[in-house]
Amino acid sequence: MAVVTMKQLLESGTNFGHSTRKWNPKMKKYIFTSRNGIHIIDIKKTSEKIEEAYQELSKIVNQGGKVLFLGTKKQIQTSIMEESKRCGQYYVNHRWLGGILTNFHTILKRIQLLHDLHKQEEDGVWKKLPKKEVVQLKRKRDKLEKFLGGIKDMKELPQALFVVDLEKEKNAVAEARKLNIKVFSMVDTNCDPDLVDYIIPANDDAIRSVKLITWIIANACIEGSGGVAEKPEQFDAKNVLKPKLPYQPNRRPYQETVKK
């Protein structure tokens, strides 16, 4: 049974690539045509690649592997957090801190500090401290939570990295490749597919497109862990809100204007 329908891919705008002036020739085989100066991705190939990624990711999780979801663009932060939590995996949805993978032992120390700060507050230690010091501790805790909250239970390196926006997250991808961590990624028409082990050619800017693909990846993790993944009909792209953009007269349809 297919994990996504062609209709869902179209409704979510996964087929809208970047401007024909901003493209990577290595993505040529995934491009169907161009329209109004925008490359249109072949959703048949997107569907095929989704199936490949789904099966491999399910296998990794079934064998006890963990997956790190990564997407730091403001409009997709919620989707990354919600779907990773739904499938019980890890996530980074704000700035990628250099060394999260390649310098993990140092990151673990920061994570431990985060746990210590939470425990101090829960145990009432902060109540005995001056207000000024408590404010500083809360500020430190909140900052750590913002950047490391999604991986605070990650005790070892993940076996797979799922990325939204390969170009923006290139530092994280480089770290994963250096450690032979498998990289799964939405790859838009301006990106280099050779950097990825499992490519999903798709629009990585539109909220609905990212939500759909991230939802599918989460389903793969759920199925791999022995759970019951949601069926395609349970996803409704129309319920995913569009980003609020400033009014522009004579603009193109939404999916074509969110591109860089």
UniProtKB/Swiss-Prot annotation:
One of its GO terms (biological process) is translation. Keywords: Ribonucleoprotein, Ribosomal protein. It comes from Phytoplasma australiense. The keyword Endoplasmic reticulum does not apply. PANTHER family: 30S RIBOSOMAL PROTEIN S2 PROKARYOTIC AND ORGANELLAR, SMALL RIBOSOMAL SUBUNIT PROTEIN US2M. Belongs to the universal ribosomal protein uS2 family. This is Small ribosomal subunit protein uS2. The gene is rpsB. GO terms for molecular function: structural constituent of ribosome.
